[in-house]
Amino acid sequence: MNQEVIAKRYASALFQIALEQQQLDRIEEDVRAVRQALAENGEFLSLLSNPNLSLEKKKALVREVFAGVSAPVKNTLLLLLERHRFGLVPELADQFIALANDARGIAEAIAYSARPLTDEELQALSDVFAKKVGKATLHIENIVEPELIGGVKLRIGNRIYDGSVSGQLERIQRQLIG
């Protein structure tokens, strides 16, 4: 079975628990923290996949490292560890965040721009493009790419809206050539 499908099942179960316990915000915050901790400490994942370390020691490590996270998140991590699927945690986190955002009417987006965008500019992008994708609002991450020259390229899911100067120049070039 595809790893993404498996991760989505665990994420869905955790999401249901979050809704039942009315702790969606807290659990999402914990899931984001776990994802970031694992991204910054790749050797921790390697340590947990070491066959020389007993399951009990691995569980103790997870309990110690993630002592501050909520019980549902910690229990999910321990369950994944028992089932030798701890490597799914980053994908599970992405899937959980997507479910939480969908429930709130929020979409994740990345805005590529030649310079850092102000909060007002990010809000204006959110206001305009949220309606286009049928969401209440967008959570936009700004990535600076000077090669865009000017304008903005916005990625929402698998859609790309290219309003950059370099994108316009490429379109003009394609029209002239072919």
Curated annotation (Swiss-Prot):
The keyword Cell membrane applies. GO terms for molecular function: proton-transporting ATP synthase activity, rotational mechanism. SUPFAM superfamilies: N-terminal domain of the delta subunit of the F1F0-ATP synthase. The keyword Translocase does not apply. One of its GO terms (cellular component) is plasma membrane. It is a peripheral membrane protein. It is found in: Cell membrane. Keywords: ATP synthesis, Cell membrane, CF(1), Hydrogen ion transport, Ion transport, Membrane, Transport. It comes from the Bacteria. F(1)F(0) ATP synthase produces ATP from ADP in the presence of a proton or sodium gradient. F-type ATPases consist of two structural domains, F(1) containing the extramembraneous catalytic core and F(0) containing the membrane proton channel, linked together by a central stalk and a peripheral stalk. During catalysis, ATP synthesis in the catalytic domain of F(1) is coupled via a rotary mechanism of the central stalk subunits to proton translocation. F-type ATPases have 2 components, F(1) - the catalytic core - and F(0) - the membrane proton channel. F(1) has five subunits: alpha(3), beta(3), gamma(1), delta(1), epsilon(1). F(0) has three main subunits: a(1), b(2) and c(10-14). The alpha and beta chains form an alternating ring which encloses part of the gamma chain. F(1) is attached to F(0) by a central stalk formed by the gamma and epsilon chains, while a peripheral stalk is formed by the delta and b chains. NCBIfam families: ATP_synt_delta, PRK05758.2-4. Belongs to the ATPase delta chain family. This is ATP synthase subunit delta. It comes from Geobacillus stearothermophilus.
